[in-house]
Amino acid sequence: MTQTQATRIVRIGSAHGLHARPAKLFAQAAKDAGIPVTIAKDGGTPANAASILGVIALGIDQGDEITLSADGDGAERVLDSLSDLLAADHDA
């Protein structure tokens, strides 16, 4: 299998940002992806996307642009799915 690396910039859609509920949904999806995924805000230090505490600690608000990176088989597909999750408004 071929190792691939992918990166996406995504604008956060949830009205209240990545608070507990959307952060939990996102972190669980990142964990279920089975490959390493990181999330970073404003070009800062990347956090493990599968860690709900790491995601919440970034203080991501609605409209923030974040960078997702994944490394492994299916990285493009994984980031497509995670990007859709982050762009959706889970507070609607």
Task: Report the location of each language-model feature.
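Intrinsically disordered, low-complexity regions enriched for glutamine and histidine
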Residues: 1, 14-17, 88
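Compact, glycine-rich, soluble single-domain proteins
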Residues: 11-60
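Long, contiguous binding/interaction regions
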Residues: 2, 24, 28, 75, ...
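C-terminal structural segments of small proteins and small subunits
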Residues: 59-92
